[in-house]
C-alpha cells in the first residue's frame, strides 16, 4: 500500500476513561479527551505567524508513472496526501485524536456503532465545486469496490454510508466492536466524484482535482513533480491548519541512485534530506557546506514506535512452512557484527513488532495476556507462555560459529540434513535454497554477508536487486522468497493489523501480509486489538499479538533508531516545539534572512 496514511500515535490512558457519547463535537479521541478545546487557536508545535512563501526542494529514490495512488496499478508519486483533504486531521503531540477538517462536527453514540459528520459549507475542491455528501459516499464505495485491495479490508466494517441531510453523512458500522472506526473513516481522503468518476481505475498523468492545501502544478513522470500552495485554499484559516503548509512551492526530484542523490544535495540541487543509512551519516556529511554552517546536520529525537524492519520470510513457500526452519534462519544473521562494522554502532536490534513503545512484549505474559492466549495453547509454541523472546546474540567479532551450530541442530531436528555440502530435506530430497529480493543495491552489503553465513550451513542463498517498479509488483503478488520490509506501527494499532497478519489477507494480492501469516490465534488477537475498550486492554491484546508473531519467526528482525537523522540547507525557520510523533516538516517556513547569508 503506497498511499499510506500518516501514522497515528497514542500515549498512556488508564482503564478509568470511558467512551463518551459525542454530539456535534469538534474532535474525537480513541480514549480520553482531546487536548485542544473547541475554539483553540493552533497546535502547540506550530508558529501561528509563520510567513508564507518560498520553496522547499525534496528528493525521492525511485520513479513514478501515475498521480493516482488509490489503485494497485502503477507506481504513484509521493506527497499526494496534501492534495486531498480528509474529514478529520490528527494532531502529533497527543494521543490518537482527530480534529475536524472537512467535517465541521462529529457525533457518535457510546458504542461507536455509527458516526455522523457534518460537512463544512465552505469546503470545496480546487475547481470551485463544493465538497458534497455525495462525494463522501461515492469515495467510500469506490475505494472499497475498485480501489487498492487495502481499502476493502481497512473499511470492511463500514456497512453503509447514508446521506441524512444536505451536509450530513452517516456511516454505519458492522462486525465486532471497533471503537477506532469513526477515526479511521475520518482519515479517508475525499475525492471529487465529478472529476474521478471516469478516471478512477486508470493510471493518471495529469494534475488531479483535489481539495487540500496544495495542487500539482507540473511534473515530468519519473523525474520531478512540483506542488504549489493553493492561495484560495478553503481551509487555510482553520485552527488545525494555522502555521502549516507555509511553502509556496514543494518540489520533489526523483533519483534512481542514492549516491547520486546525495551528491546532488551537496551541490544544493535540493534542500532537505532524511538520512536512512548509518554509514553515510557517519562518513558522508563532512563536505564544505557542513563545515561552514550552510548545511545543518541534526539528530531529532522522537517518540514514534519504530515497528519492524527485517528479512520477511514468505511462508507461502513450501521450504518456509516449518517454524523451526524459520527460527534457524535468525541464528545465521550476525547483527552485532553488522552494527559494529557497517553501522558504527548506531542501532539497536529490534525485538518486537511494536518496538519503542509500551505495546512491545518485553516481559513474561501478564494474567490478562494469558487469558487471551490460553484458548490457543495447543496451537502455539510453549515458549510464548514461559519465555521472554530474545534474538540470538553474538560478540561482534564476526565469528558466528556458535550460532551456526545452533542453526544446524535446529535444521536437523526439522528433517533438513547435509548431503554433499547442501542442505536438503531428508524425506523429499528438496534442497533448502532461496533468493533474497532487494530494491536497493545499498542493502546488498547487509544481505550478502547473511547469505554467506547461510551457505556455511548448506543453504544456497542468492541476492537479487531489481528496480522499484518490479519490486513493487513482486511484493504485490508475493513473488519472492525473502525480502526486506519495514512495517511501521502506531501507538494505536487497529484495522491495519488485518492487512499485516490476517488469514484473510494472506492470499490477497496487494495486501501487506508479506509473510503470509495465517493463524487462528493471530486472527483472534487482531480482533481483540481492534475491539479494545481502553488503553489497558489494548496493551494486553497487542502484547499477546506481538508474542505470537515473534515466536512464529516470520521475520529475521533487523534494527531501529529512535531519532530522525536530517540534513538541510540553512534557509528555513522552525517552530520552537517539535511534535512528539512526527518530523513536522509542514510547519517549517522559508526564511529570507537566512537565504541572504547563503548568498556568495
Predicted segments with their positions:
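Ligand/substrate-recognition segments at binding pockets and active sites
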Residues: 40, 274, 383-489
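Surface-exposed binding/hinge segments that line
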Residues: 118, 152-197, 201, 211-220, ...
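N-terminal lobe/hinge region of extracytoplasmic solute-binding protein
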Residues: 20-111, 118, 141, 145, ...
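Detector for C-terminal structural segments
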Residues: 22, 60-62, 75-78, 82, ...
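Aromatic- and charge-enriched surface segment that lines or borders ligand/interaction sites
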Residues: 46, 50, 71-79, 105-149, ...
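Ligand-site clamp/hinge motif
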Residues: 120, 202, 235-285, 327, ...
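Extracellular/periplasmic solute-recognition and catalytic clefts
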Residues: 160-163, 217-228, 253-317, 324-328, ...
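Gly/Pro-rich hinge or "lid" segments in bacterial periplasmic/extracellular proteins
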Residues: 63, 83-94, 185-249, 256-260, ...
Amino acid at each position: 500500500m503506497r498511499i499510506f496514511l500518516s501514522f497515528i500515535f497514542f500515549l498512556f490512558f488508564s482503564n478509568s476513561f470511558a467512551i463518551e457519547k459525542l454530539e456535534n463535537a469538534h474532535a474525537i479521541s480513541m480514549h480520553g479527551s482531546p487536548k485542544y478545546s473547541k475554539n483553540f487557536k493552533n497546535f502547540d508545535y506550530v508558529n501561528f505567524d509563520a510567513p508564507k512563501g518560498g520553496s522547499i526542494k525534496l528528493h525521492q529514490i525511485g520513479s513514478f508513472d501515475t498521480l493516482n495512488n488509490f489503485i494497485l496499478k502503477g507506481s504513484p508519486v509521493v506527497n499526494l496526501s496534501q492534495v486531498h483533504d480528509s474529514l478529520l486531521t490528527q494532531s502529533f503531540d497527543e494521543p490518537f485524536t482527530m480534529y475536524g477538517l472537512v467535517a465541521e462536527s462529529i457525533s457518535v453514540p457510546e458504542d461507536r456503532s455509527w458516526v455522523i459528520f457534518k460537512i463544512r459549507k465552505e469546503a470545496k475542491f480546487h475547481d470551485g465545486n463544493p465538497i458534497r455528501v455525495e462525494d463522501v459516499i461515492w469515495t467510500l464505495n469506490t475505494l472499497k469496490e475498485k480501489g487498492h485491495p487495502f481499502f476493502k479490508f481497512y473499511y470492511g466494517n463500514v456497512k453503509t454510508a447514508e446521506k441524512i441531510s444536505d451536509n450530513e453523512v452517516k456511516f454505519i458500522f458492522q462486525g465486532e466492536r471497533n471503537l477506532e472506526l469513526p477515526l479511521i473513516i475520518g482519515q479517508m481522503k475525499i475525492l471529487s466524484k465529478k472529476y474521478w468518476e471516469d478516471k478512477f481505475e486508470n493510471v493518471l498523468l495529469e494534475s488531479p482535482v483535489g481539495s487540500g492545501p496544495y495542487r500539482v502544478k507540473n511534473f515530468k513522470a519519473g523525474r520531478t513533480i512540483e506542488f504549489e500552495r493553493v492561495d484560495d485554499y478553503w481551509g487555510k484559516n482553520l485552527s488545525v491548519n494555522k502555521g502549516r503548509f507555509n511553502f509556496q512551492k514543494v518540489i520533489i526530484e526523483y533519483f534512481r541512485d542514492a549516491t547520486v542523490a546525495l551528491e546532488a544535495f551537496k551541490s544544493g540541487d535540493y534542500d532537505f534530506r532524511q538520512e536512512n543509512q548509518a554509514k553515510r551519516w557517519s562518513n558522508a556529511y563532512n563536505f564544505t557546506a557542513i563545515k561552514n554552517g550552510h548545511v545543518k546536520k541534526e539528530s531529532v529525537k522522537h517518540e514514534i514506535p519504530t515497528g519492524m524492519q527485517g528479512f520477511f520470510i514468505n511462508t507461502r513457500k513450501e521450504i518456509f512452512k516449518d517454524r523451526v526452519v524459520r527460527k534457524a534462519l535468525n541464528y545465521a544473521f550476525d547483527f552485532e557484527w553488522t552494527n559494529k562494522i557497517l553501522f558504527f554502532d548506531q542501532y539497536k536490534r529490534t525485538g518486537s513488532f511494536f518496538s519503542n513503545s509500551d505495546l512491545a512484549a518485553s516481559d513474561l505474559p501478564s494474567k490478562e495476556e494469558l487469558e487471551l492466549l490460553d484458548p490457543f495453547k495447543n496451537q502455539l509454541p510453549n515458549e510464548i507462555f514461559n519465555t521472554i523472546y530474545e534474538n540470538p546474540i553474538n560478540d561482534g567479532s564476526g565469528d558466528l560459529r556458535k550460532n551456526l551450530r545452533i542453526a544446524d541442530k535446529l535444521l536437523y531436528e526439522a528433517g533438513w540434513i547435509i548431503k554433499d555440502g547442501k542442505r536438503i530435506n531428508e524425506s523429499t530430497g528438496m534442497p533448502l535454497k532461496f533468493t533474497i529480493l532487494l530494491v536497493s543495491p545499498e542493502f546488498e552489503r547487509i544481505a550478502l554477508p547473511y547469505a554467506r553465513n547461510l551457505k556455511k550451513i548448506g543453504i544456497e542463498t542468492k541476492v537479487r536487486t531489481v528496480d522499484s517498479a518490479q519490486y513493487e509488483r513482486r511484493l504485490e503478488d508475493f513473488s519472492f522468497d525473502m525480502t526486506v520490509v519495514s512495517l511501521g506501527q502506531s501507538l494505536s494499532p487497529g484495522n491495519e493489523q488485518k492487512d499485516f497478519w490476517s488469514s484473510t489477507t494472506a492470499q490477497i494480492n496487494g495486501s501487506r501480509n508479506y509473510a503470509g501469516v495465517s493463524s487462528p490465534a493471530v486472527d483472534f488477537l487482531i480482533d481483540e486489538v481492534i475491539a479494545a475498550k481502553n488503553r489497558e486492554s489494548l496493551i494486553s491484546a497487542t502484547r499477546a499479538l506481538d508474542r505470537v508473531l515473534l515466536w512464529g519467526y516470520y521475520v529475521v528482525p533487523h534494527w531501529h533508531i529512535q531519532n530522525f537523522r536530517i540534513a538541510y540547507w540553512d534557509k528555513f525557520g522552525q517552530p520552537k516545539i517539535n511534535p512528539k510523533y512526527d518530523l513536522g516538516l509542514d510547519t517549517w517556513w522559508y526564511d529570507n534572512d537566512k537565504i541572504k547569508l547563503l548568498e556568495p
